[in-house]
Amino acid sequence: MSNPLNPNQTIAYLHAAARFIAEPQQPDGELRRLLREQYGIDARRLSRFTLLALLGALPLCQGLPENPAIYLASPFSSPSRMVSMRQKLAAGQPSPLDFMANLHNAATFQLAQILGSSGNSVFLAADAESCLSPLYAVLNALLAEPGQTVLLGWAYEQSGQDEQEGSVWWKISGSPMPQRQGWRIIMAAGGTAADLPHHTTFLPAALALDGRLHERGGLLLPPHGIWPALQIEPLAADE
């Protein structure tokens, strides 16, 4: 397949990143309190998965343009809500609200509602091996519509004991911000090999990508679909 890019062409701009990592066994009530106190959000009916996603995304939501797109990736939505739903079914007390709260796109819907956005709202199933796929999906969207801004997130609710829970979010668009802060995504130099951290579980894989971006100042990404190898590098002040 032909390369859709020119050498040194800036494909997209990564303006900012944010994350929320829950404390071990942090109760839902504490997460709801954080949303209420920090953002004035009544989160009483939201699933744990949605709480974790919102707490990571909302720090990036100030000053967003109208109708940003939302892309969220995870292996699944809310294991705890599914357990509760099955228990109520077994007890003959089914709850339609539990079902609606556990739909895979409930978190993206809630975030879009908070932002008042009618932009694209997409949930993507992903695991540790495919945690870069959502980024390429965003780049595909920006290739088609460069003027949009996208909130890209990776969120995870534990399905077993002693797993990390939380979410990581990037704010990406096709044009630079006036502050000239962040990174740009360009074609990697010829012969450059990607050097990505390897993890077998989802959230640690996403956290490692985000951590390497900040610790080393950039990332080298492998070819994927129509995309050649890409590089995320710090944005120069004059760009």
Question: Which role does the model predict for each range below?
Answer:
Residues 1-132, 140-239:
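Conserved "HGTGT" condensation-loop signature of ketosynthase/thiolase-family condensing enzymes
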